[in-house]
Amino acid sequence: MIQRRTLLSATAVAPLAALTGCASQNLAGYASEKPVLDLTQYFNGTVDAHGIFQGRSGQIARRFTVVMECSWKGNEGVLDEAFTYSDGTTQRRIWRLTKHADGHYTGTADDVVGTARGQTQGNAFRWGYTLALPVDGKVYHVDFDDWMYL
């Protein structure tokens, strides 16, 4: 039997200074929230997610749905994401994740600059990374503050 799970995601696009110094959410504030999000268990099989992109002002810039095919071998995971955006465009991203002994996660994908870093607390996961976004023949490096909630 195939299990499908649903996840909510809110992604804020922000300059790096806003990511590190002015974030309005605090991951520790979710520490007592239930159920606890264990990425290696939750992201195993097919996961449906719905999300938004928000600009620095908090205004919704774009909506999306994503179907993820996920698997883990030990502390190494693969999330194969198929996005459909509100304007009808589609995109695919394959994350390669590592769960570290101290509980944080790192990950890479073809359009991610460097290494993504994240951590869970309670029912929330905060994931920070820089994405290489092609726009009109140019590539922009945009910092993402990606939050996922059960």
Predicted ranges, named:
Residues 50, 54-135, 141, 145-147:
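Central antiparallel beta-sheet cores of small beta-barrel/beta-sandwich binding domains
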Residues 3-11:
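N-terminal export leaders
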Residues 30-46:
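N-terminal helix-cap/turn-to-beta initiation motif at the start of protein domains
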